[in-house]
Amino acid sequence: MNMLTALLVNITLSMLLIIVAFWFFQLNLYTEKANPYECGFDPMGSARLPFSMKFFLVAITFLLFDLEIALLLPLPWAIQMYNTNIMMLTAFILISVLALGLAYEWLQKGLEWTE
């Protein structure tokens, strides 16, 4: 019963906050609020320019390898085994999959800035 009450209160508060947020958004709409913030100065040109797809690919690659480090560092502590062969095999498989992905991206010229 307590869990049902807590769930009901959470859903009610969430819906109330969503409704209030949408209501206040429509009340205070003016052009200065819609402009991007640029260190307190007026924007120098359009701040809504599209960014390069090459930059996006390099950023995604960086995130993947950053995730690799986040997965590999706690691996010895996460696998509490006396046999380290399984842990080393798991780490090797993870690094191999990421290395194959990097090689594929390199061969497809996804990391080059000029064409």
Curated annotation (Swiss-Prot):
Its EC number is 7.1.1.2. Its main location: mitochondrion. Keywords: Electron transport, Membrane, Mitochondrion, Mitochondrion inner membrane, NAD, Respiratory chain, Translocase, Transmembrane, Transmembrane helix, Transport, Ubiquinone. It is found in: Mitochondrion inner membrane. It holds the Pfam family Oxidored_q4. One of its GO terms (molecular function) is NADH dehydrogenase (ubiquinone) activity. It is a multi-pass membrane protein. GO terms for biological process: mitochondrial electron transport, NADH to ubiquinone. GO terms for cellular component: mitochondrial inner membrane; NADH dehydrogenase complex. The chain crosses the membrane at residues 5-25, 55-75, 86-106. The keyword Transmembrane helix applies. Belongs to the complex I subunit 3 family. Core subunit of the mitochondrial membrane respiratory chain NADH dehydrogenase (Complex I) which catalyzes electron transfer from NADH through the respiratory chain, using ubiquinone as an electron acceptor. Essential for the catalytic activity of complex I. This is NADH-ubiquinone oxidoreductase chain 3. The lineage of its organism: Eukaryota, Metazoa, Chordata, Craniata, Vertebrata. The gene is MT-ND3.
